[in-house]
C-alpha cells in the first residue's frame, strides 16, 4: 500500500486493516471499507468483562493481526491476563500451549487462530478436556469456514464476528 499512498493516489481496500491505519499511521488517501483488525476482538473483551470473567489466557499468532487481536481484547477487558501466548503463524500442534493453559487455570481463553490453526486448536482443546472447564472465546477461529472441519468439537464455544451467513437479518 505504501507505494500507492506515497504516490498521492486514492486506495480503497476491502480487506481488514491494521489498527495503526486508524491512528498514527493514518493516510488521508487510504479508505478501508472493512473492519479494523482489533474491532471484533474488542467486542469479545467487553463480553468477557460483562460476563464476570476474571482470568484469561490469550492465544494468537505472532504477526500484526494477532497482535492487534490481543490488543483489542485487552482494550475492553480489565481482568487478569494470566498469560499471553504468541504462536508461529500456521502452527498446528498445540500440546505445549494446552499444557500451559491448563496450568494457568483461567476462567476463559481468548483465541484468534484463523483457518487450519483454529480447526486444530479447537479439536485439541476439546481432546485435552479443557472445553468443559474453561470458557472458549474466539474470533475467526470458530466460524463458517472452520465449523465443517471442527464439527462437534466446537460445541459450546463462543465466537465473535462482524457477520455470519446464518444470522436471521432482513
Predicted regions and their residues:
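Extracytoplasmic "Venus flytrap"/periplasmic binding protein-like
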Residues: 1-13, 23-25, 109, 125-134, ...
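Short, structured coil segments at secondary-structure junctions
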Residues: 7-8, 26, 77-78, 150-153
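Short beta-strand elements of ligand-binding domains
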Residues: 8-19, 34, 135-141
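Short secondary-structure boundary segments
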Residues: 15-16, 60, 113, 140, ...
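Extracellular/periplasmic Venus flytrap/periplasmic-binding protein
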Residues: 19-22, 28-128, 167-170
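Extracellular/periplasmic periplasmic-binding protein-like sensory domains
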Residues: 124-170
Amino acid at each position: 500500500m505504501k507505494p500507492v499512498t506515497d504516490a498521492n493516489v486514492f486506495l480503497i481496500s476491502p480487506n481488514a486493516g491494521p489498527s495503526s491505519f486508524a491512528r498514527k499511521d493514518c493516510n488521508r488517501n487510504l479508505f478501508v471499507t472493512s473492519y479494523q483488525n482489533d474491532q471484533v476482538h474488542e467486542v469479545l473483551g467487553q463480553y468477557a468483562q460483562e460476563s464476570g470473567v476474571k482470568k484469561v489466557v490469550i492465544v494468537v499468532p505472532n504477526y500484526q493481526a494477532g497482535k492487534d487481536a490481543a490488543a483489542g481484547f485487552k482494550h475492553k477487558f480489565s481482568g487478569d491476563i494470566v498469560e499471553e501466548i504468541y504462536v508461529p503463524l500456521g502452527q498446528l500442534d498445540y500440546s505445549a500451549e494446552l499444557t500451559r493453559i491448563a496450568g494457568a487455570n483461567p476462567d476463559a481463553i481468548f483465541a484468534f487462530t484463523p483457518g487450519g490453526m483454529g480447526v486444530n486448536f479447537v479439536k485439541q482443546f476439546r481432546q485435552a478436556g479443557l472445553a468443559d472447564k474453561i470458557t472458549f472465546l474466539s474470533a475467526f477461529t470458530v466460524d463458517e469456514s472452520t465449523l465443517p472441519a471442527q464439527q462437534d468439537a466446537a460445541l459450546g464455544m463462543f465466537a465473535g464476528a462482524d457477520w455470519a451467513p446464518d444470522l436471521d437479518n432482513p
